[in-house]
């Protein structure tokens, strides 16, 4: 059996410059907020995701797609550049309490064999981390996910995202990110996708210290995501995180959020978003070169 490794989703430099288009109801809300006619149809999301894959995958080492809105269409339309690997989201988002993702389970409809036949090289699992929920349940889900990936020769990517506790109102996001890393940073996955400390804001030295604390608890390669980080701050966030030990990024919003809802999205993705992704890829290569 052909077993993929993280080297199959990196750039030649060994760094990760990966694009996410697997947002689901959150993307629908972004279109609605941008003034798209309500209700925002599934086809609006699918078209945007497929167009993003076509326009941006030549500049990404991998692209993360979701089963619900674009995996089949991306495969059928050969939307992903040959130089770019495909990652498929293996998480099912369960809405509740007024938010689009209140809990997450492994998507039982996932077919790893088919994904591999379609050119997929990795799966991704979102793990919601709350201090007052059962750690063992999270660890068991990650273990099952890792086995699902590795038994089919696919790379396992976990994405712990912290949330306020179900009960009580005390929430220290920064400490929660560290606590999640302590719990899941040595869980047997191949790659850890993490929220940027301090939302990428503040003095560089503070960001670096926070990123180094994170690095101390993650015993596998790690990359940052861009949700909640101002897109103008994201290039710096990549530099700082990589100085601390990260190996790149897996991000969507910092690349394409600014064109959601604009006309001519194929053109916008090519003219506005592709240069951003190219620049981020250059930063990853530059930071990896410093390690040699």
UniProtKB/Swiss-Prot annotation:
SUPFAM superfamilies: Aldolase. It catalyses: 6-deoxy-6-sulfo-D-fructose 1-phosphate = (2S)-3-sulfolactaldehyde + dihydroxyacetone phosphate. It is an enzyme of class 4 (lyase). InterPro entries: Aldolase_TIM, DeoC/FbaB/LacD_aldolase, LacD_aldolase, SFP_aldolase_YihT. The active site is at 193 (schiff-base intermediate with substrate). Transmembrane segments: none annotated. Signal peptide: none annotated. Keywords: Carbohydrate metabolism, Lyase, Schiff base. Its EC number is 4.1.2.57. SMART domains: DeoC (SM01133). GO terms for biological process: 6-sulfoquinovose(1-) catabolic process. GO terms for molecular function: 6-deoxy-6-sulfofructose-1-phosphate aldolase activity. Cleaves 6-deoxy-6-sulfo-D-fructose 1-phosphate (SFP) to form dihydroxyacetone phosphate (DHAP) and 3-sulfolactaldehyde (SLA). Homotetramer. This is Sulfofructosephosphate aldolase. It comes from Shigella flexneri. The gene is yihT.
